[in-house]
């Protein structure tokens, strides 16, 4: 496999193109912080690399941890690891390199970011194991992405405050809600495989209600973000 082919294969495996949808979570926290403390081009660059590294490490670990589950699921059996396109060893190395990119970026930003980077990785990796024992895995995924605004705020200010905490909570609720919708696709497989999810635990109809409630709460919390940050009606 050529170098370019390898890069493209790993990019498909972790859905690298979807990083563009994850970056706004971090940039929204950075924007809140910049309004109070200013921000440099270097900080934006390191925040971007940290976010890409964190997401790549999380996706790589998820594919590695779930490779046997993916092979048994018709929806995911065509992924690169179940198909043998990439090896578990190569994916493990990819996770290590991506984790190092996150840690190095955190080191370049400030000490608090560096100290918190192992905790971030622990939460990201923990999510991949959750479906084996709890239906609350959707909330853990929300926590994984909800940490991005707070992390970006810390990257800019070196401190913790309520606006990014509330913004992170809004992201948590929104992500958990759409992940419940997504999990409805695997309802029958999850039950047969003994995997845990809100649709598998409560049924699809109740799961959809729960997802809608979470999204409604996300909107409420977003309003609180604006109030806590002193933003005007345009926000």
Predicted regions located by residue number:
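Intramembrane alpha-helical segments
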Residues: 3, 7-12, 49, 56, ...
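Membrane-proximal soluble regions of multi-pass membrane proteins
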Residues: 2-10, 15, 179-180, 189-190
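The first (N-terminal) embedded transmembrane alpha-helix
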Residues: 15-32, 144-146
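Functional transmembrane core segments of multi-pass inner-membrane proteins
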Residues: 31-49, 112-124, 138-193, 204-218, ...
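Residue-level signature of catalytic and energy-coupling elements of molecular machines
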Residues: 14, 66, 137, 186
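Juxtamembrane transmembrane-helix boundary signature
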Residues: 54-69
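Multi-pass membrane catalytic core of lipid/isoprenoid biosynthesis enzymes
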Residues: 20, 45-51, 67-117, 192-234
């Amino acid at each position: 496999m050529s170098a370019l082919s390898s890069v493209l294969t790993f990019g498909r495996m972790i859905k690298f193109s979807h990083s563009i949808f994850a970056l706004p979570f971090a940039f929204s926290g950075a924007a809140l912080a910049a309004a109070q403390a200013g921000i440099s081009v270097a900080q934006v660059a390191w925040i971007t690399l940290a976010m890409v590294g964190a997401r790549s490490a999380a996706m790589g670990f998820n594919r590695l941890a779930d490779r046997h589950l993916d092979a048994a699921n018709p929806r995911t059996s065509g992924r690169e690891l179940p198909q043998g396109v990439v090896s578990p060893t190569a994916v493990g190395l990819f996770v290590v390199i991506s984790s190092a990119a996150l840690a190095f970026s955190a080191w370049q930003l400030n000490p608090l970011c560096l100290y918190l980077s192992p905790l971030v990785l622990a939460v990201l990796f923990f999510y991949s194991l959750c479906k084996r024992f709890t239906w609350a895995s959707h909330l853990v995924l929300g926590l994984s992405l909800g940490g991005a605004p707070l992390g970006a705020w810390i990257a800019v200010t070196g401190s913790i405050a309520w606006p990014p905490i509330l913004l992170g909570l809004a992201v948590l609720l929104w992500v958990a809600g759409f992940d419940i919708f997504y999990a409805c696709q695997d309802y029958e497989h999850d039950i047969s495989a003994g995997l845990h999810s809100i649709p598998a635990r409560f049924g699809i109809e109740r799961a959809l209600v729960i997802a809608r409630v979470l999204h409604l709460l996300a909107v409420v919390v977003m309003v609180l973000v604006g109030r806590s940050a002193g933003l005007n009606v345009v926000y």
